[in-house]
Amino acid sequence: MQAMLSDKKGRVLIIEPGLGYRLEKAQYSLITNYSILSPEITKPYIVSDDDRFERADELLKHCNDSFSVAEAFQILKSVKQEGIWATRVSFVYSVNENRVYYVENNDFEYVTKHQFCNSY
């Protein structure tokens, strides 16, 4: 299990209980179904041919500064998992808008958004 927390300053905290955490401030951040901090621990549990993290990472490396929420969802749609282990929720956080967008159960036609207040 892991969590990713982001703020409007572009900082990202990836937490993996029992393993630790990593603080990032990069153009983008990703997590997947296996451990980012210690991938060797979860390697035996990875579904064969699950290279979604690597494919998404490669696509994001080629994006420019005008990268949009819609483009982020195109990438997530292209790497979604289907079947018994289908992707249940895909999140995109926009630092510029201080807003989270998400899609449930691979229904990329219906994007829900949540606006955070700007109180700090």
Feature-to-residue mapping (PLM):
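Phosphate-interacting basic helix/loop segments used at nucleotide- and nucleic-acid interfaces
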Residues: 1
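C-terminal, well-structured catalytic/ligand-binding subdomain of enzymes
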Residues: 4-120
